Curated annotation (Swiss-Prot):
Domain TFIIS N-terminal: from-to ranges: 189-266
Encoding gene per record: IWS1
Keywords of the record: Nucleus, Transcription, Transcription regulation
Highest taxon of source: Eukaryota
Cell location: Nucleus
Protein name (Swiss-Prot/TrEMBL): Transcription factor IWS1
Role description: Transcription factor involved in RNA polymerase II transcription regulation. May function in both SPT15/TBP post-recruitment and recruitment steps of transcription.
Species for this entry: Candida glabrata (strain ATCC 2001 / BCRC 20586 / JCM 3761 / NBRC 0622 / NRRL Y-65 / CBS 138)
Composition bias, Low complexity: 9-47, 302-314
Pfam families named in the record: Med26
GO biological process: nucleosome assembly; poly(A)+ mRNA export from nucleus; regulation of transcription by RNA polymerase II; regulation of transcription elongation by RNA polymerase II
Annotated Polar residues bias: 344-360
Annotated Gene Ontology cellular component terms: RNA polymerase II, core complex
Length: 382
């Protein structure tokens, strides 16, 4: 082989290798859409094979891609034309409306469940109170039936079921948020049963009385609650019984006054209170006091012994001892209840008077004259 033939042999494959190498390099540098279209066309043209269907296929795919991308671009341009703040506000408003609807439903459901739970709790406590009261009554009845025939070996029967349950009852009655639930479920009926006298005529323990009356004072009890529970009759009994402690009797009277005020239409405001008034006549009082003193003198002259005995009986032991020693006695404290109030005469005072100090009624002219006369004196200026 000659040198020219040797040179020609490797050249042909080099050209064939370079052609497919250049195409992918150009395809990699060019855009992704044009690269797959141009590379196959060059290869088919070089090979001499017809490729109309292949080129059409790529063209059709490009058209489809443009058609698909067109509405997306339009949608993006429509959204971008709006203010992003307004879009964010619209989304936030929608979310708020959805959250409010769900939260309102949940809140109503939670409130309903809570009310149902509280009602069941109060009703269970009511049953426990009634059972405890019934057990104490049965215990007292057994003790009455046994009487003196019981043996010394047996332990005495003590009714302590209500005392055991009292802390739980007070923990419920002392909660202000349960006041409406307590009144609606008629728990006052069980309170009435606890405050009623026992079969042997005795009253409940002092701790039960004091705790329940304090709880009743805090509850907003109305007339319909009293009618439904019958509590008013028991409280009236506590106001009239002599076995009740004075402080509890006063508290019972206070409760009765508060409960009966709306029934009789009375107001708790002092300004609305009706006060009977009576005009005071000083001359009439003087005449009456003179007549009384004359009668006393006449009685002393006619019946000295009887008057002395009456005077001694009217006096206290301290006053009698002071009279025997010829000494003065300190006046004793007395409680006076007035029925009539004096008629006010403040309206008779002239309205144009200006008070300067206590008891003075100098008008502006007199005050000015007095000040000017003081300033006119030479000794007062210094």
């Amino acid at each position: 082989m000659s040198d020219s033939e040797v040179k020609d042999v490797p050249v042909a494959p080099v050209e064939e290798v370079e052609a497919p190498v250049e195409a992918p390099v150009e395809a990699a540098l060019e855009p992704s859409v044009e690269a797959p279209v141009e590379a196959p066309v060059e290869s088919t043209v070089e090979a001499g094979e017809p490729a109309p269907e292949r080129t059409r296929k790529h063209i059709e795919s490009d058209d489809d891609d443009e058609e698909v991308q067109a509405p997306v671009e339009e949608q993006v341009t429509i959204d971008s034309s709006e203010d992003p703040k307004s879009q964010r506000q619209i989304l936030e408003d929608r979310l708020d409306r959805l959250l409010k609807k769900t939260s309102g439903r949940r809140q109503r459901a939670d409130e309903h469940d809570l009310e149902q739970y509280l009602d069941e709790k109060i009703l269970r406590l009511k049953d426990e109170m009634n059972i405890a009261a019934q057990m104490d009554i049965e215990t007292l009845n057994k003790r009455i039936e046994e009487g003196e025939n019981k043996s010394q070996d047996k332990k005495p029967l003590v009714a302590i079921q209500k005392v055991k349950l009292l802390p739980k009852v007070m923990s419920i009655l002392s909660k202000a948020n349960l006041a409406d639930t307590i009144l609606d479920n008629n728990l006052l009926q069980s309170v009435r049963i606890w405050l009623e006298p026992l079969p042997d005529g005795s009253l409940p323990s002092f701790e039960i009385q004091k705790s329940l009356f304090a709880a009743l004072d805090d509850l907003p009890i109305k007339t319909e609650h009293l009618k439904e529970s019958g509590l008013g009759r028991v409280v009236i009994f506590y106001t009239k019984s002599k076995r009740v402690e004075p402080q509890l009797a006063r508290l019972a009277e206070k409760l009765i006054a508060e409960w009966t005020r709306p029934i009789i239409g009375a107001s708790d405001n002092y300004r609305d209170k009706r006060i009977m008034q009576l005009e005071f006549d000083s001359e009439k009082l003087k005449r009456k006091s003179a007549l009384d003193s004359a009668k006393r003198k006449k009685n002393k002259v006619s019946k000295p012994s009887s008057s002395a005995s009456k005077g001694s009986s009217a006096q206290t032991l301290y006053e009698q001892a002071a009279a025997r020693r010829n000494r003065a006695a300190a006046p004793a404290q007395t409680t006076t209840d007035y029925k009539y109030a004096p008629v006010s005469n403040i309206t008779s005072v002239p309205t144009n008077a200006r008070t300067v100090g206590v008891g003075s009624s100098l008008n502006n002219n007199e005050l000015y004259k007095k000040l000017s006369s003081r300033l006119a004196k030479p000794g007062k200026r210094s």
